Amino acid sequence: MRILHCLRAPVGGLFRHVLDLAGEQARRGHDVGILADSTAQNALTARLFSEIEPLMSLGVMRIPMSRQPGIGDYKAVRATLSHAQSLSLDVLHGHGAKGGAYARLTRRALRARGQPVKAFYTPHGGTLNYQPGTAQAAVFLTLERLLERFTDGLIFESAYAARVYRERVGQGPAPQRVIHNGLRPGDFIT
């Protein structure tokens, strides 16, 4: 399979999850790439990207992605689409609200152009962190519901995230599954 992981912030647990998943997919023989925000950068991020890049046969691409929604998202989605179209993908896997939106909007555009790509989404919190009843939550949760029609599957890293998603967004048509992130042998102190 040809898989592209899309995420905004290459930091924290979300980034760790993407690195683990993309690395394991590559080791199992898949062609894998990562598309992430270019404005979030520190020494650790640079080191982790340099370590994973040799495994990424589809490359590591960095584009500017703002944290909050704005006009810059149009340019970023177009860049995501252009990059994804050049890769002849089987799967777009969006991580977090922004990566999930870019992956699913790109899936919609590629399908309209005859490319049968599938889009999977792992929320990792994102829009689920907004307090219900607020204007921000209403906007972001409505966007989640609208984007679900371009989603072939939802993957949650915990039962908690799956439950909160169902409570706040609802049980849409996309299949949902909990897949816990694993630990590597180096994560244990011996």
Where are these regions (language model features)?
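A short, active-site helix/loop in glycosyltransferases that binds the activated sugar's phosphate group
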Residues: R149-V178, L183-F188
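N-terminal strand-loop element at the rim of the active site
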Residues: H5-G72, A161-V169, Q176-V178
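A short helix/loop element that forms part of the nucleotide-sugar donor recognition site in Leloir-type
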Residues: R47-E51, A79, I189-T190
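Active-site proximal beta-strand in glycosyltransferases
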Residues: I3, V91, R108-L128, E144, ...
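Nucleotide-sugar donor phosphate/pyrophosphate-binding loop at the beta->alpha transition
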Residues: G72-R78, V117-F120, T127-L146, F150, ...
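Short His-centered aromatic/hydrophobic patch
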Residues: G94-G100
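Glycine-rich phosphate-binding loop signature in dinucleotide/nucleotide-binding domains
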Residues: H83-D90
